[in-house]
């Protein structure tokens, strides 16, 4: 999953 902080 892609981190929203990235």
Curated annotation (Swiss-Prot):
Native organism: Sepia officinalis
Broad class of where this protein is predominantly found: secreted
Compartment(s) of residence: Secreted
Presence of the UniProt keyword Secreted in the record: yes
Protein name: Sperm-attracting peptide SepSAP
Function as written in the Swiss-Prot or TrEMBL entry: Attracts sperm increasing the chances of gamete collision.
Residues modified as Valine amide: 6
GO terms for cellular component: extracellular region
Keyword annotations of the record: Amidation, Secreted
């Amino acid at each position: 999953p892609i981190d929203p902080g990235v």
